[in-house]
């Protein structure tokens, strides 16, 4: 694009120079003509001035139009593998100066209903042949921070059961992250009644504010960190409000961000107790995240250092699971197991029938809290049978292409060996059926551009 703009500028300059030369030539010829025709000099001068002014306006207008064609705003999805256009913050590592930023008031979700609003159809996979390992961030609208739908009640019940059964194994807050956890609680109590007024109602409780869940009757007291009059960890209170899991990263004096607060109840394949207190880099290396050292560590570190309260972002990922358990995938082993070599999708049962295959997609938001400086992850899991999403136009062909594009490291991380043969055979069959049924294959590219849907 920069080369194109440069060439256009050079071309415009040449046009201006040629125009000026032609003006001079024409003026000389014009004066000769006037002299031969015995026309008054004053009239000739006015005519020449008019012609010169008209030429200058034409050249100026062409340059103005060229300038307006140049891109003046950064793209909505920045490439964080390249150098960031923003300077690193002018503060020592581990020190945060509170920001005056206030989250914009959320607009009510149009026609939202606890019974009829369906989960958003995230399908965050792309056609091969290349699988790019990037952070995959895009800008977030503040209205979109938390997504709730007609699966809210089942998620709420499952979370309540997990809290009762596993308690601190799933929810922890370190003392140095308590201020961030309380700030997150305040943010949710401010946001949810604005975005979902038919489900949440803001309340005045004593000296502070609170919120009531109109479906469950729960009352949340921000000032007292209490639910229904009983004190609770603020992260536990937050977890009860929404369908997402939550994590807060806090920067220490070494410049690294540590997982110091979390409510991880529905992760499926990783445990908070294994990662709690770790820096971001160790969390990823201990989990064998593909390409982390080579492609992700530096841009991720830069991103966390530079993210500002007014600039939240989103990302999506996906996995294949071979059982129907949302909270913990039982096919990979016991949630309390201490396996040599770790536990993950690569320890799942092998070659189970496709009826046992589920599509597990995460929609994550990241934002910095303005007062405490903590960086909050919200992790919303969407969970559907493969046999359901494979009925959607283009999905089986696109998903099969994406799976085949995984490299060896990605394939191991996602457990492809455990289900690949069975799943790909099924997806190929469903894609062939769609093509035979008249699917416009040329339309696939248009669908792919709708990422992450």
Model-derived regions, located:
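Extended, well-ordered protein cores
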Residues: 4-453
